[in-house]
UniProtKB/Swiss-Prot annotation:
CDD domains linked to this entry: ALDH_F18-19_ProA-GPR
Protein name according to UniProt: Gamma-glutamyl phosphate reductase
Gene3D superfamilies tied to this protein: Aldehyde Dehydrogenase, Chain A, domain 1 (3.40.605.10), Aldehyde Dehydrogenase, Chain A, domain 2 (3.40.309.10)
Biochemical pathway: Amino-acid biosynthesis; L-proline biosynthesis; L-glutamate 5-semialdehyde from L-glutamate: step 2/2
Family: Belongs to the gamma-glutamyl phosphate reductase family.
Gene Ontology cellular component terms for the protein in this record: cytoplasm
UniProt-recorded Gene Ontology molecular function terms: glutamate-5-semialdehyde dehydrogenase activity; NADP binding
Length: 431
């Protein structure tokens, strides 16, 4: 274990050797964890939650250290919000661990069972994926959510958090380790990469000599693009949230205002925040001005098209890039668009297939939007900030997968399993 003691980004660290050791220990732990009882896994999670509550002050001090470093790098307000922990957020992290412990164990779940004419009984049963590498940026809570979900689904996890949240993640990981120890499970089942050296990411993307089965990136566009370009193992891609709200001609104005304000401004830095507002030309005369002024008065900057710029001098002109930008801040792009067909086409062209919403009282229009918009999550009359595993009843999530293979939408327990076939015979041979 000496090679895995906490280190920083010192040049003398042998990163390939360090990561190779992590991979080997994770692979050995994965087998033991795949056979672990539900009771042991739940105990580990409950003890980890208890440790988080006990070590709140330690975590706040570590987080203050992270915030100091981020401010020194001139991080913006949305970034600092994602990084910040307080008593309430720490309790939410601990409660999330308890909630994952309370969820049904997905491992061993019978997915299908049938009998063939020759008497063979075939069962499809959920199994762990193996070793999951998770690469993420500034959110300290991801350390707990990702580690806990992988653990409950019987997977070993190698967590590589952002350098900005290094000290916070270290305390959270220590709490998870205490839980594993208390439950008699391998401590290396959830590993935190103990260096901020960026070379560690490159080693993970190579697969650590075949020890990593899947990579899950959670972060900005540049991180996900690098992972997709360089990874030699399968990837659950979590692309940026260029999320749209389309205000249809049959939208209730009061309902639209409430939804849009929440979707943009509740927490502008989360991946489910709305970034683009499309207003149907047919309701522009009644809806555009009040919605625009509501956002401006609430402190949201607007990048608008020509029609939106005439509403208020505080609106600045949108550039072409604004229609495909994840601001992660109190900024939104607003455009008037000619009906449902054009709105769907705009989302297909400029969106990231993450989360998109229509606001309308016309059920036929809503049904078309839900059927034709090819995003992981499509919504009708609800805030895009519900794009969250916890809100979906998954307990938590590792991210929102925007690809089309295996996992799509919130990646929770079920998405962190695969399956195998069990075949029961009574001496049958194939003719």
């Amino acid at each position: 274990m000496d090679a895995l003691q906490l280190v920083s980004n010192r040049s003398e660290t042998d990163v390939p050797a360090l990561m190779h050791a992590l991979g080997q220990q994770a692979r050995a732990s994965a087998h033991a964890l795949s056979l672990a009882s539900t009771e042991a896994k739940n105990l580990a999670l409950r003890v980890a939650a208890e440790q988080l509550r006990k070590r709140t002050q330690d975590l706040l001090l570590a987080n203050a250290r992270d915030l100091e470093g981020a401010k020194a790098q001139d991080a913006n307000a949305a970034f600092l919000d994602r990084l910040t922990l307080d008593d309430k957020r720490i309790e939410a992290i601990a409660r999330g661990l308890d909630e994952i412990a309370a969820l049904p164990d997905p491992v061993g779940r019978m997915l299908a069972r049938y009998e063939r004419p020759n008497g063979l009984v075939i069962e499809r049963v959920a199994t762990p994926l193996g070793v999951i590498g998770i690469i993420y940026e500034s959110r300290p809570a991801v350390t707990a959510d990702a580690g806990a979900l992988c653990l409950k689904a019987g997977n070993a996890a190698i967590l590589r958090g952002g350098s900005e949240s290094f000290f916070s993640a270290t305390i959270i990981h220590a709490c998870l380790t205490e839980g594993l120890r208390a439950a008699g499970l391998p401590e290396a089942a959830v590993s935190l990469v103990p260096t901020r050296d960026r070379a560690a990411v490159g080693e993970m993307l190579k697969g650590l000599d075949g020890t990593i089965d899947v990579i899950v990136p959670r972060g900005g566009k540049s991180l996900v693009a690098r992972v997709q370009a360089e990874a030699r193992v399968p990837v659950f891609a979590h692309l940026e949230g260029v999320n749209h709200i389309f205000v249809h001609r049959a939208a209730d104005l009061e309902k639209a205002a409430i939804i849009i304000r929440n979707a943009k401004l509740r927490r502008p830095g989360v991946c489910g925040a709305a970034e683009i507002l499309l207003v149907d030309e047919a309701c522009m005369a009644t809806h555009l001005a009040p919605l625009t002024r509501m956002l401006l008065d609430a402190g949201c900057a607007i990048r608008g098209d020509a029609a939106t710029q005439t509403i208020d001098p505080r609106v600045t002109a949108a550039m072409e890039s604004d229609w495909r930008t994840e601001y992660s801040d109190a900024i939104i792009a607003v455009r008037v668009i000619d009906g449902l067909n054009k709105a769907i086409a705009h989302i297909e062209t400029h969106g990231s297939h993450h989360t998109d919403c229509i606001i309308t009282e016309d059920q036929e229009a809503a049904d078309r939007f839900l059927a034709e918009v090819d995003s992981a999550i499509v919504m009708h009359n609800a805030s895009t900030q519900f794009a969250d595993g916890g809100e979906f009843g998954f307990g938590a999530e590792i991210g929102i997968a925007t690809g089309r293979l295996h996992a799509r939408g919130p990646v929770g327990l079920e998405q962190l399993t695969s399956f195998k076939y069990r075949v029961h015979g009574n001496g049958q041979i194939r003719p």
